[in-house]
Amino acid sequence: MSTASPLPCLAIAGPTASGKTAAALALARLLAERGQAAEIISVDSALVYRGMDIGTAKPTPEELAACPHHLIDIRDPLQAYSAAEFVQDTQRLAAEIRARGALPLLVGGTMLYFKALQDGIDDMPAADPAVRERLDAQAAQIGWPAMHALLAQVDPATAARLAPADSQRIQRALEVWHVSGKPLSSFHTRSGKNAEQGLVSPGGFFSLEPQDRAWLHARIAQRFDAMLDAGFIDEVLQLRARGDLHLDLPSIRCVGYRQAWESLDGLYSMNSLRERGIAATRQLAKRQITWLRSMPARHAIACDTPDAQQQLLQAAMAVVAAATQARNG
């Protein structure tokens, strides 16, 4: 195979605990055996944060060493990282990776990032710390359900799709309204913006989806138990010891961290942490699968079958071979 990258990139998406990391590393190894280097671009809004390793199931040092990874450990937990920043970073990284003669692999489960990369996004107002501080103070007085009701008055379309307790997204929607005077729902994705750039090759978007939800639920429970055994609570305690992090930050709202933080705050018992963490992770997986099924161009692979990884490898290599043949004429 030519050392020049024969296609822009492949993507491996899927809900949490579906086997994305293992599949991506197996594909990278197979490509290397065929003479084609590959580099992984993480599509995960939690992996960007430093010091949040156990609760995000961050790739191990051995896995990170097996293949170059990007967009991991690029932000302090105090900082935000937007979908717009992800799109800009990924487009830049993909170009740099191709220039090195390597093949970019987009791997992760943050579906908003995938959709933003696929459709493009309108230029929304930047975060305004002063506005956020006022909104946080108001929420502390009246609660997020009441803030949700306020959002419904100025942006009913966005309020209708958000749960009253979804503080992070309610805050962002109200922030956009206060900064721009326009509802968040007026900032639409621009379908096809990136189509001509061909960032993901036709046929190259692979989705690991379970046929049996019980299989995924069992893996989620096993993963959460493994996190607890690996010292997840100690990791959260270290974050709390900094003194500058709190529940209103996107980093601490990540699934698992939020539940642990609330338990340590005394809002819930520590005995209920496992049950609440697993339930929240199941809900995340359900939302991820719903997003995936709205993406018609995906190549879905049943991740709960014994040969799921082999199916993905065969399909991915077929896309690479077809692209190589087309390039070589």
UniProtKB/Swiss-Prot annotation:
Pfam families for the chain: IPPT
InterPro entries in alphabetical order: Dimethylallyltransferase, IPT, P-loop_NTPase
Catalytic reaction annotation: adenosine(37) in tRNA + dimethylallyl diphosphate = N(6)-dimethylallyladenosine(37) in tRNA + diphosphate
Keyword Zinc set for record: no
Keyword Transit peptide among UniProt keywords: no
Residues of the site described as Interaction with substrate tRNA: 110, 132
Necessary cofactors: Mg(2+)
Subunit relationships: Monomer.
Protein name per its UniProtKB record: tRNA dimethylallyltransferase
Organism: Delftia acidovorans (strain DSM 14801 / SPH-1)
Annotated gene: miaA
